[in-house]
């Protein structure tokens, strides 16, 4: 059995505290930026894109703001609306945790579509680039959830359980680590393997976005059964969480994206 520290502070500078959540969240953004920049650079070298790195960095900077705002709004609206309705000031307390992936995804996809339409750039190509960066960033992003002791698993009477002292004294499933390994590492590994096979020619087909969408939605749907989150009734015999419902929609969207990519490939032949 493993127990986390009761403090979420990584280190302090004078009276200013630096939290693990902020450190790891910033690291996830840095990893995503580094990987996406290198992909765009390679695409330019092979003639698959004319998007300059300066343009891409500007796109990412605004995209980051969009993702943070939409992720926070997603958490507020999807998961704990009543609490934030009664405590509106807490909406701005991001350091307490509470960024919903699906909210960020919705905001980012809208931003990508509008940006690409304005710049006459392939939106599928940008989605592919961002999907690989997102899967890599999610590895440390879920570690941020782990050290912030949020999104914890159900009580698990096992020597492999983890105690989150800010929650209670019971060992629980470390579901954040499960998600880091599947939504992050597994999705990234499959995408890189597909990239090695196709030698960059598959960018702009939406394939990497589809791989990420399917791996993420499937793995999170399963892991949600082990999370200590409120379930909602769908039928008399089936209980699903809000996250699982959003994952079902994400899976369907991935299949639609696959169909769109296939149609574009057929038109180019």
What are these regions (language model features)?
Residues 1-269:
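Hydrophobic, membrane-interfacing alpha helices
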């Amino acid at each position: 059995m493993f127990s986390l520290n009761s403090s979420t502070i990584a280190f302090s500078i004078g009276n200013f505290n630096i939290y693990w959540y902020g450190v790891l969240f910033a690291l996830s953004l840095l990893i995503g930026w580094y990987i996406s920049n290198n992909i765009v650079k390679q695409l330019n070298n092979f003639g698959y894109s004319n998007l300059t790195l300066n343009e891409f960095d500007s796109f990412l900077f605004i995209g980051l703001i969009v993702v943070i705002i939409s992720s926070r709004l997603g958490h507020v609206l999807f998961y704990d609306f009543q609490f934030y309705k009664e405590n509106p000031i807490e909406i701005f307390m991001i350091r307490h945790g509470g960024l919903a992936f699906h909210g960020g995804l919705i905001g980012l996809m809208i931003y990508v579509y509008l940006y690409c339409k304005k710049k006459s750039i392939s939106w599928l190509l940008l989605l592919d680039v961002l999907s690989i960066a997102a899967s890599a960033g999610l590895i440390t992003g879920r570690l941020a959830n782990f050290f912030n002791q949020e999104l914890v698993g159900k009580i698990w009477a096992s020597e492999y359980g983890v105690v989150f002292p800010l929650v209670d004294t019971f060992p629980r499933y470390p579901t954040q680590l499960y998600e880091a390994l599947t939504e992050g590492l597994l999705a990234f590994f499959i995408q890189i393997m597909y990239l090695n096979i196709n030698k960059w020619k598959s960018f702009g087909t939406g394939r990497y976005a589809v791989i990420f969408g399917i791996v993420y939605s499937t793995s999170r749907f399963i892991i949600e059964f082990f999370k200590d989150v409120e379930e909602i009734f769908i039928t008399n015999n089936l209980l699903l969480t809000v996250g699982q419902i959003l994952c079902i929609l994400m899976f369907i969207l991935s299949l639609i994206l696959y169909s769109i990519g296939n149609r574009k490939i057929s038109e180019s032949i």
